[in-house]
């Protein structure tokens, strides 16, 4: 059995899943996710953890089938799909990628606040929410303090997952 990955999120998810399920799966690194998707569709690898947007064309064409989402709970973006936590009976398995908007250290507070207001206004627009959903993402408005808390929490979570999976720097 083998799993492919074209980015660090896929690597950590695959390694964590293999370690937690005690599946002996060989990790196959790819330069990019599209190459891994092609090999998955062609049967060269057994499974792949990948974002919804990258996999959507292959799923729509019938070449690939989605099995579960990596968020702790099922996602509205993938109706009918269970979470890995429930499908594989792995309580607490929660590896959702996220993106934040960052600025340079020392950015004036008034600039940070203006950017935050503008970003939150944009994320509240229906067409933006729909566009994010079409890319397999959910908009999560907030402020700089919330993002900082999220980043600190996620650094701990991902650091623990990397250590649990036995991934070491190359």
Residue spans for each PLM region:
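Conserved, function-defining micro-sites of small-solute handling proteins
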Residues: 1-170
